[in-house]
Amino acid sequence: MKYELDKTDGNARRGRLVFERPQGTFTVETPAFMPVGTYGTVKGMTPEEVRATGAEILLGNTFHLWLRPGQEVMRKHGDLHDFMQWHRPILTDSGGFQVFSLGKLRKITEEGVKFQNPINGERIFLSPEKSMEIQYDLGSDIVMIFDECTPYPATFDYAKKSMEMSLRWAKRSRDRFDELGNKNALFGIIQGGVYEELRKVSVEGLVNIGFDGYAVGGLAVGEPKEDMHRILEYVCPQIPADKPRYLMGVGKPEDLVEGVRRGIDMFDCVMPTRNARNGHLFVSDGIVKIRNAKYREDTSPLDPECDCYTCKHYTKAYLYHLDKCGEILGARLNTIHNLRYYQRLMAQIRQAIEEDRFEAFVQEFYAKMGKPVPPMQSEIKSDEG
C-alpha cells in the first residue's frame, strides 16, 4: 500500500490509498469511510450492494473471525476476500478492542490476554504474535497492531502503564508481521487516553518503530467530544504527513466532519448499519426515525438529495410499513440508504477540499441540521489565553 497526498485545505487532507492486489490496482480515495463487516459481511448486504453505495474498502473483525469460522476454514478458502467474495481492500482490527471489552472475562499480562471464549466458554489466549498470524491468514490489506484500548475514564497512571505496554506490543506486532513475510500494510495505534503528554510518547514510540499508517485509538469510548477534538488537534500534527491517519470506531456524520477538520483520513463505524436496523436514517438535515407514526402515509422519499436505490424507488410510507411488519427488506433498504449517505458525505468532503472550500462546506453542513459549528479546541485555548 502507498499513500498519496494531493492537497490540503487547512488541516483537511485530500489523497488516496493505492493497493496492488492479485486482481489489479485498487484505489481508495481519502478521506474515506469504511463500512464494518464484523463477521465477513456487512449485515444484510451482498458485496455488490456494498460497492454500489460507493464503498472502496471494508473493515473485518479479527477477533470474531478467529472464533468463527477460524483460521483453518479461512485458509481453505484462500483468505477473507475469497471467503466473503469482496476482492477490494480490507482492513482488519487486531482483536484488542473486543478482548478488552470482555471485562471480567479476561486477564491481561505482559504476554497477552487470557479470556473466556464468549461462544463456548473455553479459555483462550490472544497475543500480539497471534493477532499478526490470524490477520496474515485473513489476507488483510491493512493489518492493525495488537494494543490495549485504554478505557475511559482512566487515571494518568493507568493510562501511562497501558500506553507503555501497547508500545511494547506494537514492537512485537511489527517483529512478527515481518517474520511472516507479510507484504501488506501494518498500522500502529496511538494510545494514551485523554492525556496529551502520554499521546506524545505513544506517537514518538510508534514512529520510531515505523509503520505504514497511524491510527488514533482510545477515543469515542465515552469521553466528552471536547476531549476527542483536543486530542486529535494535538496528535495529528505529530503524525508524519506522508502517512495515512485513521480514527478508529468513529462515528456520527458530524464526527467524520470534525475528524477531517483536524487532519484525519480514514474512519470506520457500525453506526450507519446498526442505526439502519433500528429505523434511524441519516438525511441531509438530520435523522428520520422511520418508526414514527407520522410517516405512515408519507409519499416522499427519505432524502430528495440522495441518489441511493432506496430513495430512488421507495417512499417513507413504504419503509415505515416494512419496519412495522418486521420485513427483512426494510432493514436492507435502510442499510443501503445509510451506507450511501456516508459515502456521499465523504465524496462531498473530498470535493470541498479539492475546491478550497472545506470550511464553507462545514458551515453549510451544520446549517442544514440547525446546529452550531463546534469550535476548534486550540481556538478556545488561545481565547482563554
Swiss-Prot record:
Gene3D superfamilies named among the record's database cross-references: Queuine tRNA-ribosyltransferase-like
Q: Name one GO molecular function term.
A: tRNA-guanosine(34) queuine transglycosylase activity
- Name the coiled-coil region(s): none
The pathway to which it is assigned is: tRNA modification; tRNA-queuosine biosynthesis
Q: SUPFAM superfamilies this protein is in?
A: tRNA-guanine transglycosylase (SSF51713)
Q: Name one GO cellular component term.
A: cytosol
BP terms from Gene Ontology: queuosine biosynthetic process; tRNA wobble guanine modification; tRNA-guanine transglycosylation
Which positions bind substrate? Answer: 93-97, 147, 191, 218
Task: Tell me the segments the record calls region RNA binding.
Answer: 249-255, 273-277
Co-factor binding comment: Binds 1 zinc ion per subunit.
- What does the entry list as the binding residues for Zn(2+)? 306, 308, 311, 337
According to its UniProt record, which residues of this chain constitute the active site? Answer: 93 (proton acceptor), 268 (nucleophile)
Catalytic activity field:
7-aminomethyl-7-carbaguanine + guanosine(34) in tRNA = 7-aminomethyl-7-carbaguanosine(34) in tRNA + guanine
Q: Name one Pfam family in it.
A: TGT
Keywords linked to the UniProt accession:
Glycosyltransferase, Metal-binding, Queuosine biosynthesis, Transferase, tRNA processing, Zinc
Name the NCBIfam families on file. Answer: Q_tRNA_tgt (TIGR00430), tgt_general (TIGR00449)
Subunit structure and binding partners: Homodimer. Within each dimer, one monomer is responsible for RNA recognition and catalysis, while the other monomer binds to the replacement base PreQ1.
Q: Which family does it belong to?
A: Belongs to the queuine tRNA-ribosyltransferase family.
- The protein's name is Queuine tRNA-ribosyltransferase
